[in-house]
Amino acid sequence: MIGIIDYGMGNLYSVSKALERLGCPYVLSGDKEELEQARGLILPGVGSFRDAMHILNETGLAAFIRSAVENGTPLLGICLGMQLLFDESEENGPTKGLGLLRGRVVRFPGVTKTGEPYKVPHMGWNRLRFHRPSPLLRGVEEGHVYFVHSYYVIPGDEDVVLASSEYDVDVPAVVGRGCVFGTQFHPEKSGAVGMSILNNYVGIATGRGNG
């Protein structure tokens, strides 16, 4: 069973429907005791980094997530959920994240180095470029996936970047270290490529994808 962490800021419906399509049992909950029963966790997220961390800290879910990861429970952060895995964000003023991966979250400049303006948020389909092998990407093609975001991660350690995309700058699109994974894009809205990544994560969490 996969636990989708409900803290009031996730794209819960589309993630839960994607798991249903994969035939994967899940629980959608903000209750720590319920989530403790899950073999893997998904942290979705849409909205403000500062608001999300405030809720996670106030509800005790931030401490729960850190403890679960320390105990080896796989975790997948999606979109804002991926950004929350890192040390801090500059959105609405400096805010500490979960600190599970080193790095900080910054806003797209909106202007290229040559002075050309471009649209922020980044919204649309971009191709993945793989950098490192991972069980999360096993059998996945370097296809196009769907992004909606105004901020991106500058990693403290490039080794956590499993795949990137390009939108004026190099955007870490898939990250991972140990049992912690993240996608900046929405795998549940990214067609066959996204569903393959979600299916691999379910395999990692349930023990059929660790080989």
Swiss-Prot record:
Which Pfam family, any one of them, does this sequence belong to?
A: GATase
Q: Which UniProt keywords apply?
A: Amino-acid biosynthesis, Cytoplasm, Glutamine amidotransferase, Histidine biosynthesis, Hydrolase, Lyase
| Cellular-component GO terms for this entry | cytoplasm
Supply the SUPFAM superfamilies for this chain: Class I glutamine amidotransferase-like
Give me any GO biological process, just one: L-histidine biosynthetic process
Which locations, inside or outside the cell, does it occupy?
A: Cytoplasm
Q: Identify the domain of life.
A: Bacteria
Its pathway is: Amino-acid biosynthesis; L-histidine biosynthesis; L-histidine from 5-phospho-alpha-D-ribose 1-diphosphate: step 5/9
Cite the Glutamine amidotransferase type-1 domain residue spans from the record: 1-211
Q: What would you give as a GO molecular function for this chain, any one?
A: glutaminase activity
Enzyme Commission no: 4.3.2.10, 3.5.1.2
Active site feature? 79, 186, 188
* Quaternary structure and interacting proteins, as annotated: Heterodimer of HisH and HisF.
UniProt-recorded name of the protein: Imidazole glycerol phosphate synthase subunit HisH
**Originating gene:** hisH
